[in-house]
Every structure is written in structure tokens, then in C-alpha cells.
């Protein structure tokens, strides 16, 4: 196991063995500085690190995380399942355009008080 395969935070660990984009300063800062809220959309979640940071920080939040990449979605799914906040995290394997169109067609597109994209 290579050291860069995992990234450890205080309350969770990120498995990033499959994702091309590894956790970096940009995701750490965005996750720390994002306003948060109760209905959060994470576009291009990658490993799910920002969604997890927001779930940890915002105990009343429900988070929808959208990811198109076949490899990153594997890591995000594992990271969400291993977290204490799995019941508040929804992972969608789709492009943002397809996610948006499906939500619109189903009449389920809701309002979000925080949208993050890294």
C-alpha cells in the first residue's frame, strides 16, 4: 500500500486508490471554507472529501454528490459507506448535465443552499 493511497483527517480517512485526482490543498481549503447549509450539492465529488468535510461540519445537512468518473466513484462510494455520515450522503454516478436533466424531468430538483464544485 502506497502512502498516497489514503489521506487521513481527524474523523475520517479518504481512500483515493482509484481516483486520478488525489486530495490536495484546494479540496482541503474549499471544504473548510464552504458555507455549508442543510441542502448541499457537490458537483464532481471525486473521492468525496468535500462532501465528507461538510457532513462532519454541518450535522443537519443532506448532501448529494455527483461524479461522472468510473474510478473516482468507487473511492467516493467506499468513503461514504465508511463514514459516520453515510445516512446523509447520496452519491450519484452521472454527469452534472444528466443529473440536472433527470431531476428536472422527475420534478425532484430541489433548492440547494450550498453548491460546491472542485
Identify the role of each PLM range.
Residues 1-2, 107:
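Alpha-helical structural elements
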Amino acid at each position: 500500500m502506497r502512502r498516497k493511497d489514503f489521506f487521513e483527517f481527524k474523523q475520517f480517512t479518504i481512500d483515493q486508490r482509484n481516483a486520478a485526482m488525489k486530495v490536495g490543498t484546494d479540496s482541503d481549503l474549499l471544504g473548510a471554507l464552504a458555507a455549508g447549509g442543510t441542502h448541499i450539492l457537490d458537483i464532481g465529488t471525486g473521492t468525496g472529501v468535500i462532501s465528507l468535510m461538510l457532513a462532519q461540519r454541518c450535522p443537519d445537512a443532506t448532501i448529494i454528490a455527483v461524479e461522472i468518473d468510473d474510478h473516482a466513484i468507487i473511492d467516493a462510494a467506499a468513503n461514504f459507506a465508511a463514514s459516520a455520515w453515510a445516512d446523509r450522503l447520496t452519491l450519484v454516478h452521472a454527469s452534472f448535465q444528466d443529473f440536472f436533466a433527470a431531476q428536472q424531468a422527475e420534478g425532484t430538483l430541489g433548492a440547494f443552499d450550498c453548491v460546491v464544485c472542485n
